[in-house]
């Protein structure tokens, strides 16, 4: 079993620290300072970094981390080749911490965005999927983003999902506006408000939960997804 900890960074980022014993893998380091502090405080060995896509709020910590750990294994798609020395492709399989890690194509937000699924248990999805939402489609390729969501929907419902941003409350306000009222949505929104009032993360989430509250996962076809995405972009 892995110990997974969110390292808060910037205004709303989570850098995920995946820990096994005294070793740690870092996902999408937007800032090196909190990562280095976390490693030092917990006396950990940094063994690898996983990058999901090439936006600065996921990679800005890389220069400092690579200067400290020049031999580090860094996994990521071609669009982060300036930092990654292990280029991954969709449906590649890695072995990390004795887990089979599947690389899932998650394009749309960026052209080569990927997600990492640890043994059908833990999904690190960057900006492809949020609690109650999904990433903006900066590429304009709505088909790719819709297809990514279908891949996520096909996973076991017990999978824990680790997005890179704390967007849950704003996403749930949109969900409340476009979905039929439900006990699940009300209860999850209430829980999220309590957690944020205590400055605690609302993440991780689960696929089971997201299927109940995430409008984008409920879109039945591409046209409905595009309409929802345009609504959210202007919400």
Curated annotation (Swiss-Prot):
Pathway membership, UniProt: Secondary metabolite metabolism; methylglyoxal degradation; (R)-lactate from methylglyoxal: step 2/2
SMART domains, alphabetized: Lactamase_B (SM00849)
Listed EC numbers: 3.1.2.6
Pfam families: HAGH_C, Lactamase_B
Stated role: Thiolesterase that catalyzes the hydrolysis of S-D-lactoyl-glutathione to form glutathione and D-lactic acid.
Domain of life: Bacteria
InterPro entries given in the database record: Clx_II_MBL, Glyoxalase_II_hydrolase, HAGH_C, Hydroxyacylglutathione_Hdrlase, Metallo-B-lactamas, RibonucZ/Hydroxyglut_hydro
Free-text remark on how the cofactor is bound: Binds 2 Zn(2+) ions per subunit.
Major enzyme class: hydrolase
SUPFAM superfamilies according to UniProt: Metallo-hydrolase/oxidoreductase
Binding of Zn(2+) 2, residues: 57-58, 127, 165
Reactions this protein catalyses: an S-(2-hydroxyacyl)glutathione + H2O = a 2-hydroxy carboxylate + glutathione + H(+)
Key words, A-Z: Hydrolase, Metal-binding, Zinc
Gene Ontology terms, MF aspect: hydroxyacylglutathione hydrolase activity; metal ion binding
Cofactors that this protein relies on: Zn(2+)
Quaternary structure and interacting proteins, as annotated: Monomer.
UniProt record similarity statement: Belongs to the metallo-beta-lactamase superfamily. Glyoxalase II family.
The name this protein goes by in its record: Hydroxyacylglutathione hydrolase
Organism: Actinobacillus pleuropneumoniae serotype 5b (strain L20)
Residues the record lists as binding Zn(2+) 1: 53, 55, 109, 127
CDD domains attached to this UniProt entry: hydroxyacylglutathione_hydrolase_MBL-fold
GO biological process: methylglyoxal catabolic process to D-lactate via S-lactoyl-glutathione
